Each structure stands twice: as C-alpha cells, then as structure tokens.
C-alpha cells in the first residue's frame, strides 16, 4: 500500500470541499468522486463548487472528477469519505471494487443508520478493511473557517500511529495544525455526541436561555460524553483534548454550526420537518440522537441531555417542558 499515494475525496459537500482545499495545498492532484454529473460540469465551468464554499477557488487541472465510484476507487490509494452518514450506504451500494487494500479515512461525523455502527467499524466489519488501515479526522474545524484560512486544528485517529503521522503530515499547512491519536472509536463517538449537544445548546438558545445556562449545559455535556466514552470504549484518554472538548465547544457555540442552528429553530417552535426544509443542509445530530439512544439501551449510561434531545425530536415533547426538567437535574 502506498501511503498516502493518490488521494480521493469521496463526497461533494462543504466539508468535502474544505478537505479538498487542505489536501491540494500539499498534493499535486486529487481524484474527486461526486454523485451528480451536472454538479461536476458546473464545478469545472466555474472553478469552484457551485453549491458549497463557493468562495474557494480550485485549479481544475489538478482535479480528476468522476461520478463513477468504482473508477475513482480503482485509481486511488487513500479514500477520504466525506458524505453525510445517512447517505453512506447508498453510495457504497454502487461499489464493486474491493477497498480492503486501500487506506480509508473517514471524515464522516455520524453513525451508519440501521447498522448503528460508527463508520470505522462499518468499513472494518462489512468491507473487511483492516483496523490499522482506517483513520478518522476530527476537529475542532469548521469548513467555513478552512475556506477563510483561519488557524484550525485537526486530530487524525488511527490504531497504527505511524500511518496517522504520515497522513497528518499530508494535511498540515500554514493554517492547519495536526495531532494524532490511537483512540479511533472514542473520537468518532465524541463527534456524534457533540452534534447532539449542539442541538441541545441551540434549543436552549431558541428558548432564550442565556450564556450562564449555556455554560452549565456544556459543563454537564462534557461529563456526559466522558461517561459514555468510558463505557462504550474504555481506554485512557484526556477528555479535555481538542478532539473531544474543543470540538464540542466550537460545535455548540459557533454560528457556523448547522446543528446549533437546527436546535435553535426547534427551540423557537419549528417542527423537525420544517427546520430541515428551511436549512437545506443535513444536521447530523438529528440522526445521531436516535442512534446513541438505541446504543444506550444496552449500555445504560446516565445521559439526561441525550434523553432530552431525543424526547424533543422523536417523542415531540415540548422543548420548554423538556429543558425545564433538564435544568432541575443540573448542578
């Protein structure tokens, strides 16, 4: 296996576009899989993604676009998957080329629905990719700030630390700092949880709770995250590292956070469906909430914030009532 070898971006959204920008700062060229031919043609004509991060310009001659996932996989050594988790299986259904000899990087911040597996486990169990050939990318890092080249930090998780370091060097640049970690599962679960807590923060904002309460909410959220991670994947970790606490903070507080925006709309009285229609973007935390709730039926971790968000989104309990109950459980 060449590492990183020829890199492919698998997805066409804002995070995929940001990662392509980061990779192309070091790589001479990339392969780029996008599902829609019309989007590819527009990209080539305009010199930028026509739908996401439109301010980011690309030198098109350095990008080999294709809507054929098998062609892209065959011609690449490292595959960076950057699609919303609910759509991953539909993309992979078209895949006839084996990927177990590729280096798989997941920048997907979610759990595969129906399977209730984090993405690294899904690639390992379903596609036979060795665990040491799977890496994850974690923040704190908003795509919009990558577009602006604001200083950002990425953590690369891989059970093979040497491979993590090689790939991390491929991403490092003047505005991207990188670190590595062997805690693949912990980083992935933390990425799912941060979206749920960002929705909670948004709901509270929509209900006009102030900064004082938001601080208490996030303090309790990091404790809840720590309890869950220590139960589902008990390894030594520092929960205050940027891949855990840092990513949680930026996702919960930033105006770029679509999950916080989604939560704010729910807090203001929008239904789930109307909020999703108005946003026109995927709020991963909506799907992640149900997945974590299902997982926790077997783990029995005390997770009052996740429970509250689930009750609001799926049981249609009034946000005002549910958050009031939550406030009574905090200290």
Question: Residues of each region from the PLM?
Answer:
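NAD(P)+-binding Rossmann beta1-loop-alpha1 motif at the extreme N-terminus of oxidoreductases
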Residues: 1-56, 63-67
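Nucleotide donor/acceptor-binding cores
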Residues: 4-6, 102, 152
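A short helix-to-beta-strand connector/capping loop
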Residues: 56-65, 129-133, 174-176, 301
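Rossmann-like NAD(P)(H) cofactor-binding subdomain of soluble oxidoreductases
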Residues: 66-74, 78-149, 167-169
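Alpha-helix C-terminal capping/helix-to-coil transition sites in glycosyltransferase folds
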Residues: 74-75, 193, 245
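Internal alpha-helical scaffold of NAD(P)-dependent oxidoreductase catalytic cores
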Residues: 87, 98, 126-133, 151-238
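NAD(P)-dependent Rossmann-like dehydrogenase/reductase catalytic/cofactor-binding core
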Residues: 201-205, 230-331
């Amino acid at each position: 296996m060449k590492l990183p070898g020829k890199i492919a971006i698998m997805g066409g959204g804002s995070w995929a576009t940001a990662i392509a920008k980061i990779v192309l700062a070091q790589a001479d060229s990339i392969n780029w899989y996008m599902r829609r031919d019309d989007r590819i043609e527009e990209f080539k004509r305009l010199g930028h993604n026509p739908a996401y991060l439109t301010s980011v310009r690309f030198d098109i001659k350095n990008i080999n676009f294709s809507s054929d996932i098998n062609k892209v996989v065959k011609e690449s050594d490292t595959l960076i998957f950057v699609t919303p988790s609910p759509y991953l299986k539909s993309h992979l259904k078209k895949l006839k080329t084996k990927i177990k000899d590729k280096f798989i990087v997941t920048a997907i911040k979610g759990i595969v629905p129906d399977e209730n597996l984090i993405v690294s486990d899904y690639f390992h169990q379903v596609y036979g990719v060795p665990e040491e050939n799977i890496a994850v990318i974690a923040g704190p890092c908003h795509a919009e700030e990558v577009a602006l080249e604001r200083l950002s930090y990425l953590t690369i998780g891989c059970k093979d630390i040497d491979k993590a370091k090689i790939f991390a060097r491929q991403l490092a640049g003047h505005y991207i700092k990188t670190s590595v970690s062997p805690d693949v599962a912990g980083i992935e679960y933390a990425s799912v949880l941060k979206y749920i807590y960002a929705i909670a923060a948004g709901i509270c904002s929509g209900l006009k709770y102030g900064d004082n309460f938001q601080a208490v909410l996030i303090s309790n959220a990091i404790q809840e995250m720590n309890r869950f991670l220590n139960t589902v994947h008990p390894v030594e970790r520092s929960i205050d590292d940027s891949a855990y606490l840092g990513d949680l903070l930026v996702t919960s507080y930033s105006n770029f956070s679509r999950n916080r925006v989604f939560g704010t709309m729910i807090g203001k009285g929008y239904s789930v469906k109307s909020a999703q229609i108005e946003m026109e973007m995927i709020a991963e935390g909506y799907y992640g909430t149900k997945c974590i709730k299902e997982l926790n039926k077997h783990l029995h971790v005390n997770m009052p914030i996740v429970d509250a968000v689930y009750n609001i989104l799926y049981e249609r309990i009034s946000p005002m009532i549910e958050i009031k109950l939550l406030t009574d459980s905090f200290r």
